[in-house]
Amino acid sequence: MKRLISTLNLSKEDWLRYRKCGITGTDAGAILGLNPYRSAFQVYHDKISDTFENIDNEAMRQGRDLEDYVAQRFTEATGLKVRRANAIYQSEEHPLLLADFDRLIVGQKAGLECKTVSPFSADKWADGKIPAHYMAQVNHYLAVSGFDCWYIAALIFGKELVIHKITTDKEVLNNLIAKEEHFWKYNVMPEIPPVPTGSEGDTQQINQLYSADDRNKTADLNPIRDLLDKRQELSDQIEQLEQEKASIEQQVKLEMQDAAYGTAPGYKVSWVSSESKRVDSQRLKKEQPDIFNRYSKNVSSRRFTIIHASQFLYAYRHTKFALQLFLFNRKAQYCLHNNNCMLR
């Protein structure tokens, strides 16, 4: 590997700009479809856009602030000294692959990735487990560096420090590199987005890309008619399964009667009363319009609906029947008013 640029005096914007020039360790899990918080679709749009994806939150802030502490605890536990990398590195064999290492192990061809973990996610590290997207990240670092092994030190708040050693597996690395290079060659370079995964992140990305609508424009969806048919088929299946699920829940309630709780091998069931207070917005708007307006805000969004032809037919028949019933009632009222009960 080679040292691409020092990060000691690198601005956040320049750091983000360099990361757009290739695939980084945090991109790896998303490209493989292993990251529950980010997808290949999101990585793609980050790479091709002119803007910088400066994502930050409290968990990420704590991770940065506690990186030194985790590294110190790793040294205490293993006796291995570490040093900062202070650079963005690039694979010489595969220049597309970039990396920004947390720490390098002094005197060894090895590195360290520091993690902080919520106690609510402790089960993901239990019994020797490592979250899949972190495994992808570490293997990416092994691919960039050509090192023999990489360590992960995960501080689970209030519980323990978990340390794992991952050794180089050529087959795994070759597979990872092939998928990353395929993503870059067939998606990023020709600017052809990968298929969305259905994740919430992908929905947010699409809504951000197309936040406004043109009411004078209608798209021809014939080329993807098969997708619409597939969606309708899935919707029908979901509706049937939801009804079956509701039927089962009703049977369970009949079995429980007035019992608040129920048990069966492998199951705990509760059916308890609860109370909650909700704001009656219509009444508040009517009786206290000033207060309602003061705490109200306009939210703009695009509503997405798909209506199948069968639903059009149902709506037409329902509307036609309702109209006939309305006319019949009007005629009946007229006859009764005029003492004429002959309805024709």
Feature locations, PLM:
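Accessory terminal regions of nucleic-acid processing enzymes
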Residues: 1-327, 341-344
